[in-house]
């Protein structure tokens, strides 16, 4: 298959079931919202057993629970330990959102399968001086801080979601890496319910490693700088100098497929994109398979 002269490899992306908390951050101004949203989702950590997240969308004041500018963010955890998820999530909230002036955090998880109680790992930052109050039909924890005050909904919903859908766009030149990638990120951002936790990712990985304590290491057959060293074992196509990846997490398979389609169709508008492929583990590890030809 080709789109605008770009070859779409007949392969698939492998994705995994994880748990997701979707929340809405608000603040007095959009600059603070952006800082809180990007800081709290800045480190993709699923492959090392930590929380990862992404910014789904930004909102005007008339679209949020408290009539202030806001952002919807998603936080994912790949392991079944719900208590560990709560602890990891609390680090993001306490260190990246609570510390920003005039912020609040609201539950926005659709159709939650359960709820996390925010008092134990976040509310008690008030050291016993925190209190519960009602706001707009929501039960909020008010945490007294030096710039009064941080408010967080007492229960945050979580649900099963899908992590790790991806596609690679193989480029001829560095300009295309950034231009096509940024355009694809913007196109994916128009799809409700998905995030791109790595933005443009320059380091595809593999599960096999010579150094187990590192975790996933570089996917060496796809490193252009190793083409000559690897010889026939290199999988970098002729003319390709760069293989960036875009990883997508989403609340549903349907949303992920729509996002994959939007991203792939966008990168194929650029002459410097020679081929589109995807990362997988031969279908042995992931719960979900997204065929590239099937979504286009």
From Swiss-Prot:
Keywords: Transferase
Name of the protein described by the UniProt record: Formylmethanofuran--tetrahydromethanopterin formyltransferase-like protein
Example GO molecular function: formylmethanofuran-tetrahydromethanopterin N-formyltransferase activity
Any Pfam family hit: FTR
Organism for this UniProt entry: Methanothermobacter marburgensis (strain ATCC BAA-927 / DSM 2133 / JCM 14651 / NBRC 100331 / OCM 82 / Marburg) (Methanobacterium thermoautotrophicum)
NCBIfam families: PRK02114.1
Gene expressing this chain: ehaS
Domain of life of the organism encoding this protein: Archaea
Source taxonomy: Archaea, Methanobacteriati, Methanobacteriota, Methanomada group, Methanobacteria
BP GO annotations: one-carbon metabolic process
Family statement drawn from the similarity comment of this UniProt entry: Belongs to the FTR family.
Gene3D superfamilies: 3.30.70.520
